[in-house]
């Protein structure tokens, strides 16, 4: 399949293959997981790669602070993906992609202009931010109070959002329905994973869909893949990752109550796609803290850089109006399902075994059941005779 796609002229790579019907709306969602490699291979990789690994998704520094800090986006994409051999000898990253067909309506206006109450519940927001990992300057959980049940019940939720009980929180208006998904997983870097993702998308006719979205977090390698292989798809930054940065910046250097009130204003702007208002408020707050990228100002500086870098992927009101997904919870759920198979305190893989199992797990989690097709075709190829190797005289 990959060879067939790569052999096509560029003009034909977005056409529908023969016998395939293009869906109405699709999304490609990309993320990364973790697994452990056997020590001898990990040490060999550490000797071969003497480059530092950022580990977390790249977060650019505000333009005004570039003189005092290294710009994250200046680093090469392949260096972004180098393994953390200097810090964690065993852990390595794998790439996961979900190609989903979706169903939703196109609306004349934003079907959900008001911020859902789930994002106004302090303990829920704290849990979301903790899971993403951006909590610099945020007070301990004990200083937050849960939203009363009668208030929480008015909100809405998405797949993967923190403890939002189904009985309490209804689905967000306009949220797309997932019809089917195809899963890909590999230990290969984005330079190899990107073409594979595009080839499978082509084979399913996704490039010919009327509405197409590419959803991911802020990792630079995700957007390198999007720009190179899915340039005509609408790029959407995962809302939860953006929320975590805004939450940390709002509370940095403030008392909990004051910071929470600021967060509610800022996250409302973000939800409504009013990114320039949010960016102006962040820059003002950063200046109040004296600028720079150290101390209390660090969380604000990081958020300013993050919003500056991804502001073209944050028009959430327009995305909801088009019925597109605004969160990467579908692929994050798949990453966890893959992790249930490959991660564990006593699970250490060789590179070949890890690659094979990642691909098998991805096929198992795909709705089109490629494993069933494989076994059926394999049975048809069997002759009942055992192949014999010729003996060398």
Predicted regions, residues:
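Catalytic center-proximal scaffold of phosphoryl-transfer enzymes
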Residues: 1-393
């Amino acid at each position: 399949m990959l060879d067939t796609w790569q052999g096509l002229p560029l003009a034909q790579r977005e056409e529908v293959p023969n016998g395939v019907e293009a869906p109405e709306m699709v999304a490609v969602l990309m993320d990364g997981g973790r697994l452990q490699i056997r020590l001898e291979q990990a040490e060999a990789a550490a000797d071969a790669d003497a480059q530092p690994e950022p580990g977390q998704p790249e977060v650019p520094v505000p333009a005004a602070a570039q003189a005092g800090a290294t710009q994250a986006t200046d680093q090469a994409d392949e260096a972004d993906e180098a393994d953390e051999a200097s810090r964690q000898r065993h852990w390595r990253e794998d790439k996961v992609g979900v190609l989903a067909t979706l169903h939703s309506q196109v609306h004349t206006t934003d079907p959900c202009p008001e911020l859902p109450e789930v994002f106004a519940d302090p303990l829920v927001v704290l849990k979301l931010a903790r899971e993403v990992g951006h909590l610099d300057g945020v007070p301990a959980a004990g200083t937050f109070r849960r939203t009363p049940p009668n208030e929480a019940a008015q909100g809405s939720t998405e797949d993967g959002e923190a403890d939002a009980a189904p009985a309490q929180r209804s689905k967000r208006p306009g949220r797309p329905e997932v019809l089917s998904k195809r899963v890909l997983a590999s230990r290969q870097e984005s330079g190899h994973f990107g073409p594979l993702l595009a080839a499978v998308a082509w084979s399913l006719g996704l490039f010919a869909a009327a509405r197409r979205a590419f959803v991911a977090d802020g990792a630079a390698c995700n957007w390198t893949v999007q720009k190179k292989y899915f340039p005509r798809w609408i790029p959407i930054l995962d809302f939860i990752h953006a929320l975590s940065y805004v939450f940390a910046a709002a509370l940095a250097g403030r008392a909990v109550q004051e910071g929470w009130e600021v967060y509610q204003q800022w996250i409302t702007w973000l939800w409504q796609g009013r990114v320039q208002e949010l960016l102006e408020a962040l820059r003002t707050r950063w200046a109040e803290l004296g600028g720079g990228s150290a101390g209390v100002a660090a969380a604000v500086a990081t958020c300013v850089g993050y919003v500056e870098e991804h502001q073209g992927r944050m028009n959430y009101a327009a995305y909801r109006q088009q019925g597109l997904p605004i969160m990467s919870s579908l692929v994050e759920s798949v990453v966890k399902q893959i992790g249930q198979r490959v991660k564990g305190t006593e699970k250490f893989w060789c590179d070949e075994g890890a690659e094979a199992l990642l691909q098998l797990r991805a096929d198992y989690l795909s709705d089109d059941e490629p494993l069933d097709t494989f076994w059926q075709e394999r049975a048809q190829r069997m002759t009942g005779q055992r192949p014999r190797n010729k003996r060398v005289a």
